[in-house]
């Protein structure tokens, strides 16, 4: 049976504002959704994938890279020729992990179009704020001519508001190493997710650290994750707890031996919770937990 890797991440506390450059009138707005009956802010999976691709490119060449000067993506193999059945070319890590799609319309009437598609092996969920958005908005004023495209008429500042949210974000990933052309890339992906850094959407101006403060890995032969969005806000150390996950472990739905936990959430565990998690690997650091999860992958590969 295949080994599946699932992970739940939660970021440090930070302040999000002006994500994706959306506006409502003169208010720069955050993306929002209703979560458990309350309004929460959210960051798209594509924003996380974009940040991850940059990290991956620092480890080995990626097919798709972003040119900050031209503000456009560049492709080394736009035809994805390395993925043809008979090709012996080396594939790019981002294509292998994150997938691709290239569709072309029919060149002549009555002919069918073609598409080259690879589904992402590394699937990423949308990030959701750990706490509801309370409606915080700051008042700002842009000075006349603040940017070359700003309003040129008049000498008065231009007022605008900015929605902001002081919170943590949590998201999850799913990965089946055996589905990769190069299975060892699963280790690279986990390492880079644990050192992700800033994530923001289009025109995002805010700096928000998306490196996880706490993490839960599950390495299992079961196809169901059962740990996504496992974190809940808490007043204990680290600001989070894992009540729902602990119930699943206690009931036998998630075997403790399949889990690797790391970060501040471990420091906040009580004696009874540690007893429930007997058999799981507990690390006070995220990096140590990531290394432990990667070690399990490497042992499995052997």
From Swiss-Prot:
Pfam families: DevR. Disruption phenotype: Essential for sporulation, decreases sporulation 100 to 1000-fold, aggregation is defective. Keywords: Antiviral defense, Fruiting body, Sporulation. It comes from the Bacteria. Induction: Part of an operon going from at least MXAN_7266 to MXAN_7259 that includes a CRISPR operon with transcription continuing into the pre-crRNA locus. InterPro entries: Cas7/Cst2/DevR_bac, Cas7/Cst2/DevR_sub_I-B/Tneap, CRISPR-assoc_Cas7/Cst2/DevR. This is CRISPR-associated protein Cas7/Cst2/DevR. It comes from Myxococcus xanthus (strain DK1622). The lineage of its organism: Bacteria, Pseudomonadati, Myxococcota, Myxococcia, Myxococcales. The gene is devR.
């Amino acid at each position: 049976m295949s080994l599946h890797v699932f992970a739940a991440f939660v970021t440090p506390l930070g302040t999000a504002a002006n994500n994706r450059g959306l506006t409502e009138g003169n208010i720069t707005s955050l993306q929002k959704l209703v979560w458990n009956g309350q309004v929460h802010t959210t960051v798209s999976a594509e924003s996380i994938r974009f940040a991850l691709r940059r990290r991956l490119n620092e480890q080995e060449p990626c097919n798709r890279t972003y040119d900050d000067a031209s503000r456009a993506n560049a492709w080394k193999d736009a035809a994805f020729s390395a993925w043809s059945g008979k090709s012996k070319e080396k594939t790019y890590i981002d294509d292998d992990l994150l997938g691709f799609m290239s569709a072309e319309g029919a060149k002549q009437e009555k002919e069918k179009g073609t598409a080259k598609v690879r589904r992402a092996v590394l699937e990423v969920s949308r990030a959701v704020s750990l706490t509801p958005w309370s409606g915080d908005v700051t008042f700002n004023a842009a000075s006349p001519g603040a940017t070359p495209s700003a309003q040129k008429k008049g000498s008065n500042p231009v007022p605008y508001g900015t929605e902001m949210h002081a919170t943590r974000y949590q998201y999850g990933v799913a990965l089946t190493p055996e589905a990769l052309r190069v299975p060892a890339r699963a280790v690279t992906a986990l390492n880079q997710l644990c050192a992700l850094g800033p994530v923001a959407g289009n025109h995002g101006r805010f700096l928000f650290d998306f490196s996880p403060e706490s993490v839960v890995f599950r390495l299992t032969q079961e196809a169901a994750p059962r740990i996504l969005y496992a974190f809940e806000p808490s007043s204990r150390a680290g600001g989070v707890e894992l009540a729902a996950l602990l119930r699943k472990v206690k009931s036998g739905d998630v075997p403790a031996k399949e889990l690797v936990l790391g970060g501040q959430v471990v420091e906040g565990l009580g004696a009874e919770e540690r007893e429930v998690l007997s058999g799981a690997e507990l690390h006070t650091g995220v990096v140590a937990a990531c290394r432990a999860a990667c070690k399990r992958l490497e042992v499995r590969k052997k």
